[in-house]
Amino acid sequence: DVAMATRSLDGRADVIYTSLDNNVVSAFEAMASAANELKIPVIASDEFSVRRGATAALGVNDYDFGRVTGEMVYRVLNDEAVATVKPQVMNDLTLYVSPKHAQAQGVTLSDEVLKDAINVDDQ
């Protein structure tokens, strides 16, 4: 149980970082709720987890990710050998924040952070 595992971090963790693990994603709201109770900030790897309860995420823009993926698929569909299509690294990262979730987790986001971030609460 993800919520129970989150509660076991009480006094043992200053922050929780989540990736796109299937167990965490399927129970994200329960984990975020437990983190709120404990005032442990949740930092995620994707925008949608911020919408679901994380304080912030520094991740790739899904549109850009899809565009790069589409370019790779296009090359394969045009008879380029899969073995010659090199993996791509996404270097342009976007900061997503939720002041609402930050407050619930005991975090104050500075004006400087808010200035440079996409506030998912505004969307």
Language-model region placement:
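Short hydrophobic alpha-helices and adjacent helix-cap/hinge residues
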Residues: D1-Q123
